[in-house]
Amino acid sequence: MTMTLHTKASGVTLLHQIQGTELETLSRPQLKIPLERSLSDMYVESNKTGVFNYPEGATYDFGTTAPVYGSTTLSYAPTSESFGSSSLAGFHSLNNVPPSPVVFLQTAPQLSPFIHHHSQQVPYYLENEQGSFGMREAAPPAFYRPSSDNRRHSIRERMSSTNEKGSLSMESTKETRYCAVCNDYASGYHYGVWSCEGCKAFFKRSIQGHNDYMCPATNQCTIDKNRRKSCQACRLRKCYEVGMMKGGIRKDRRGGEMMKQKRQREEQDSRNGEASSTELRAPTLWTSPLVVKHNKKNSPALSLTAEQMVSALLEAEPPIVYSEYDPNRPFNEASMMTLLTNLADRELVHMINWAKRVPGFVDLTLHDQVHLLECAWLEILMIGLVWRSMEHPGKLLFAPNLLLDRNQGKCVEGMVEIFDMLLATAARFRMMNLQGEEFVCLKSIILLNSGVYTFLSSTLKSLEERDYIHRVLDKITDTLIHLMAKSGLSLQQQHRRLAQLLLILSHIRHMSNKGMEHLYNMKCKNVVPLYDLLLEMLDAHRLHAPAARSAAPMEEENRNQLTTAPASSHSLQSFYINSKEEESMQNTI
């Protein structure tokens, strides 16, 4: 086997031929690669001299000629050998070179431009535009794994050497967000979520107008970038599901008008503080409504979460009351009315304790608390009766030991009609599968909403109290919606169920009016003597009723007689006073 030896002169000649061949290949039109972006200080042109620093601290002058390898006909390393097996193994196998020609730049001067240590090579891609060459750093190949320290150092250098435009583009790339509704590019934070312009405008039109969208399919249409206009109903449903809401804004984005309102509120609070300090020195006849509003604003009831509201209402539920029913005694009109009125009178005592534990109720004045109870007591008793009777179709569970059906109610004149309405309401609750949490919310709504529009006075204080009641009602309504959403109902089902429950409250109000009229007729006929607290409640309801203001003179005479009667120890006002005295004594002890 013979081996051909080349002299030094022939080796230099071979080097020049290789360089000429490679440069000729790069000058062909089909190998021109357009620049991806403008050259910066990091990109070196062929007619310029640049110095690059590497982690090792060595420098390399690019003014010298760099060896270029781009021909696919040459191979300087056997592909079967692993990396690092020879001094030439640091190069790519040129049979598998990337589309752009590669320049290997040595980080320190070597004896020969062909021989480099593999840890000293950094690949760069050549870029050609109008005959001037530039270069950009290429991603390291799979087998090029610098140490972690060098990699972090190199990243810091590249970040510090990038221009301002590059850094801004990287920042905008990191801030790219997508629409929560259709997954398109988000244009900003609209109505509480990141959304695109199309979904923002669609939601704005939907909440401003009266658009009753109907899904032609099953209310489960796919809403994405391409199909968001196919179904308006499902698109609006998804807007609500992802959290879009009217008035939803980012906390860090407040317009000038909102900041102005905030400053006005702060100035108003400061004036309220001055007014309260002045009030101690010189008390006036009228209480400042601003001071009262500031106190109501800090009420604990308005800061409760939905779960806390439900827990408070469940804990406030009154205990079970048993009747004095004697199975051996047959029913007649007098015995049944005596049994029911006695049971109602004892339930009223527990109702007062329950109302005082409803969040926000004790923040009202004593007059307003009594007024609401006088307007709602029979509605509250009836909804409790209907709730207990849900599991007993065709019967009414007045107490655990008193279960009556429709036929038993016939012994009292006019009772069958009320029985039928109560049984129908219980069947409706049973069909809707009313939950205990929903029941306590409905009962609280009845208490707070019963007399909110019947305040006789129109002073600033009463108007402020009415506004506070509305805010507590909104809080309980939000709790109802939270319970429905928690049960897994869709948005449309939540709206439908909420409307159905609130419509039942109007039916309960109608039953209460019928029951109040029947009870008043029984009192006028002297069929049964009414107990003190129940009698006071009945008379108070008659006084607050609109029809009572234009009643006949005979009814006026009856009311005058009732008004001049001595106050009972079981009266509502005295019960409140006695309970407050007991609480103060317990606190003192």
Swiss-Prot record:
Positions in coiled-coil regions: none
Record comment regarding domains: Composed of three domains: a modulating N-terminal domain, a DNA-binding domain and a C-terminal ligand-binding domain. The modulating domain, also known as A/B or AF-1 domain has a ligand-independent transactivation function. The C-terminus contains a ligand-dependent transactivation domain, also known as E/F or AF-2 domain which overlaps with the ligand binding domain. AF-1 and AF-2 activate transcription independently and synergistically and act in a promoter- and cell-specific manner.
Described function: The steroid hormones and their receptors are involved in the regulation of eukaryotic gene expression and affect cellular proliferation and differentiation in target tissues.
Name of the protein: Estrogen receptor
Cysteine-cysteine disulfides: none
NR LBD domain segment(s): 305-541
Skewed-composition ranges (Basic and acidic residues): 254-272
GO cellular component, one term: cytoplasm
GO terms, biological process: cellular response to estrogen stimulus; estrogen receptor signaling pathway; positive regulation of gene expression; regulation of transcription by RNA polymerase II
